[in-house]
A protein has these predicted regions:
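Conserved long alpha-helical elements within nucleotide-processing catalytic cores of c-di-GMP signaling
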Residues: 10-34, 47-51, 55, 61-68, ...
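Conserved short hydrophobic interaction patches
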Residues: 31, 35, 73, 77, ...
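A short glycine-enriched loop-to-beta-strand structural element that forms part of the catalytic core
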Residues: 48, 82-131, 143-149
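Short helix/loop segment flanking the catalytic signature motif in cyclic-nucleotide metabolism enzymes
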Residues: 53-88, 121
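Conserved metal-coordinating catalytic motifs of nucleotidyl cyclase and c-di-GMP turnover enzymes
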Residues: 2-5, 51
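Flexible, glycine/charge-rich interdomain/linker segments that couple
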Residues: 135-170
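Short secondary-structure junctions
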Residues: 36-41
Length: 172
């Protein structure tokens, strides 16, 4: 599962307006769909879960190539959504929530990838995917990040301690 989100989208939406913001969301959806069709298989699926959040469901052997294609394409395509001045500067100068004017990077695509190997809950999937997406968003630019923990639903081996505890006869 790949959880995709747009970085710096609020600043773009506030600066360029909701209509242009909707175009950026549509651009992201189109690029993710293209990457899924180009690098995935017939079982791959894309879902828009709201706002600027998307979920791709694909086989592990496809999801990295899909994410790589999507982030590369989005990096090129998003530049066309900015005025010449912002595009050349590589950022947008806008007033933040704190009332201070500052420079914000262009919108970028961050993707967190998790793997599922067996039964698990939707809560576990959502929490882990959100955690890895947050990690991806902490890096600058258009990036994807894999969860390095064991896949969700995988059975972790339980250590076996042979002769670790004496039998009652041995203890006596």
């Amino acid at each position: 599962i790949a959880y995709a989100d747009l970085d710096n989208f609020k600043v773009y939406n506030d600066t360029y307006g909701f209509k242009n913001g909707d175009r950026v969301i549509k651009l992201a959806a189109d690029i993710l769909d293209w990457a899924m069709r180009k690098r995935g298989d017939a079982a791959s699926r894309l879902f828009h879960i709201g706002g600027d959040d998307f979920v791709l469901i694909a086989k592990p052997e496809h999801v990295e190539r899909m994410s790589q294609a999507a982030t590369r394409c989005f990096k090129r395509a998003i530049r066309g959504c900015y005025c010449t001045q912002d595009r050349e500067r590589g950022s947008v100068v806008a007033t933040g929530r704190d009332g201070v004017e500052r420079s914000y990077p262009l919108v970028s695509l961050s993707i967190g990838i998790i793997e599922i190997a067996g039964p698990c809950t939707l809560m576990e999937i959502g929490e882990r995917a959100a955690h890895v997406k947050k990690y991806a968003k902490s890096m600058p630019g258009n990036v994807f990040a894999w969860d390095r923990r064991p896949p969700l639903g995988s059975v972790q081996p339980v250590p076996v301690f042979i002769n670790a505890c004496p039998t009652p006869e041995e203890a006596a």
